[in-house]
Amino acid sequence: MASSSATLSLCSTFSAHCNVNSRRSSTILCSLSKPSLNLAKPLTGFLSPSTASTSRTAFTVAPKFAESVVEAEPETTDIEAVVVSDVSEVTEEKAKREEIFAVIMVGGRQYIVFPGRYLYTQRLKDANVDDQIVLNKVLLVGTKTHTYIGKPVVTNATVHAVVESQGLNDKVVVFKYKPKKKYRRNIGHRQPNTRIRITGITGYEEYPASPNVAVGEVNL
């Protein structure tokens, strides 16, 4: 009985060993039949967790650009300060130029002129470009302290100007129409003009002036 039990145990262990070996051989055959895939290395086209983390860190580093922009802000403020100073200088120059003005008549029309400004008038005959002209019909001259009112003109007062160009005004369309006559006319006209620049106002000092009076002090 002891010998038979020993033989049975040996057979059982031998069969188990055979089953294990058969399983191992089947796994080896399967591994040989299927291509080996290394899970440690990621396939091309897919991101591993390490690369995804590095890409995320790259995006977090992007705010450095915003830091550089913040550092450049003081330069823009300096530029704005320079522009403001230039504007103040221009306003001071305009104030100096507009200390005096005059009202003149050219071609039956009245114009308010300031030294340094340009003006479009009707075509001045026999006037070429860069010619210096003198306008004698001065109706009024005004300064900060006095006003010279002409009766009808301010005697000895003259306005000096320079001819800059001879041109044409914008086109004016003239349309003619007659009902039930099939009459239509569309005509365009451009009036010739002259551009002059005022250089100075002189000769008004000898004319009797009236002091400037505030509106509240006028006696009616």
UniProtKB/Swiss-Prot annotation:
One of its GO terms (cellular component) is nucleus. GO terms for molecular function: mRNA binding; rRNA binding; structural constituent of ribosome. PROSITE patterns: RIBOSOMAL_L21. It comes from the Eukaryota. GO terms for biological process: chloroplast organization; embryo development ending in seed dormancy; thylakoid membrane organization; translation. The keyword Signal does not apply. It is found in: Plastid, Chloroplast. Keywords: Chloroplast, Plastid, Ribonucleoprotein, Ribosomal protein, RNA-binding, rRNA-binding, Transit peptide. It holds the Pfam family Ribosomal_L21p. This protein binds to 23S ribosomal RNA in the presence of protein L20. Part of the 50S ribosomal subunit. Belongs to the bacterial ribosomal protein bL21 family. This is Large ribosomal subunit protein bL21c. It comes from Arabidopsis thaliana (Mouse-ear cress).
